[in-house]
Regions:
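NAD-dependent ADP-ribosyltransferases
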Residues: 1-144
């Protein structure tokens, strides 16, 4: 069983967004995804999500299972001049809905693809969630 506490870093340019009283939403909530698949479609979706230059919406929301990693990422963004930097704390045991999520390194290994160099360091702690994380799971946040 994986972790149940996660941290989402968001800023003015984040593709996935928090909505008051609804939760966190991926930019694309319509695309069907089967995490158990090994087909090229899933691989393409995950690769696009990890490509920071990609402008095509993806059905994923990135989060970290390590608070220190999330806060370092948030501080990096502040240092780059990003505005509206916020770290959300997510407790999936508080969620009133079941959600699907996977560790990015384990998924990359199963799909046999290389994580981009710029994303490698944090990927050990990174999880991608499918479509939506309900408001009930968002237990706290801090603004930087």
């Amino acid at each position: 069983m994986g972790p149940h506490i996660f941290f989402r870093v968001e800023d003015e340019d984040s593709r996935a967004r928090y909505s008051d009283e609804e939760g966190l939403f991926a930019e694309d909530t319509d695309t069907w995804v089967n995490f158990k698949s090994r087909d090229r479609r899933l691989l393409g979706q995950v690769e696009r999500h990890l490509d920071w230059g990609n402008r095509v919406p993806t059905p994923f929301i990135s989060m970290y299972c390590d608070e220190g990693v999330a806060h370092r990422e948030a501080e990096r963004r502040v240092g780059e001049g990003k505005k509206d930097v916020r770290v959300y704390k997510i407790n999936m045991r508080k969620s009133d809905e079941r959600r699907e999520y996977r560790n990015i390194r384990l998924l990359a290994e199963r799909l046999d693809f290389d994580i981009p160099e710029h994303a490698w360091n944090n990927s050990e702690y990174e999880y991608i969630f499918l479509h939506h994380v309900p408001y009930s799971a968002v237990v706290d946040w801090i603004d930087l």
